[in-house]
Design a protein with these regions (language model features):
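Acidic, metal-coordinating helix/loop segments flanking the phosphotransfer/catalytic sites
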Residues: 34-52
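Active-site residues of response regulator receiver
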Residues: 56-57, 84
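Non-catalytic signal-transmission and effector/linker regions of two-component phosphorelay proteins
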Residues: 1-9, 15-16, 22, 73, ...
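The feature encodes the CheY-like receiver
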Residues: 18, 60-61
Length: 123
C-alpha cells in the first residue's frame, strides 16, 4: 500500500499536462494517479489515501471549483493545488476561499509544483 503522504492525484482534461506532471513527479519518487476529469478522480478507490490533489480549474465536464466542493465533503483535509491559465485576483481569491493550498499559473516553467508537493507530502 502506498504511503498516504506520497500519493498524488492529478486531475486535468489536458493529456499533455497529465503526462508531463506524472513524469516529473514519478522522477521524484512519488506515487501518482492521473485522471482526465473530476468524475474519474471521485471514482478512484485510492482517493482516500491521497496526500495531495493537483487539479485544473477549467475542466470540461466538472470544473475545478465544483470538484473542490465535492472533495471538501468526501475527503476533508486533503491538500489541493489548483493549476490555471487565468490566475486573476478573482480566481485566486475564490480558490483561497475554497481551501486551495496554492494556485499555480500554467505554463509551469520551474520546479514550483514539485517543491510545493514535496512540502505537502513530506518527500
Amino acid at each position: 500500500m502506498a504511503d498516504r503522504r506520497k500519493l498524488v492525484m492529478i486531475v486535468d482534461d489536458d493529456q499533455a499536462v497529465r503526462d508531463s506532471l506524472q513524469f516529473a513527479l514519478r522522477l521524484e519518487g512519488l506515487c501518482v494517479h492521473v485522471h482526465n476529469g473530476g468524475a474519474a478522480l471521485l471514482a478512484d478507490p485510492s482517493l482516500n489515501r491521497a496526500g495531495c490533489v493537483v487539479l485544473g480549474d477549467r475542466m470540461r465536464q466538472m470544473d475545478g471549483f465544483t470538484l473542490l466542493n465535492t472533495l471538501q465533503t468526501s475527503n476533508p483535509g486533503v491538500a489541493t493545488i489548483m493549476l490555471t491559465s487565468h490566475a486573476t485576483p478573482r480566481v485566486r481569491a475564490r480558490a483561497e476561499a475554497a481551501g486551495v493550498w496554492k494556485v499555480l499559473e500554467k505554463p509551469l516553467l520551474d520546479n514550483a509544483l514539485v517543491d510545493d508537493i514535496r512540502s505537502i507530502v513530506g518527500a
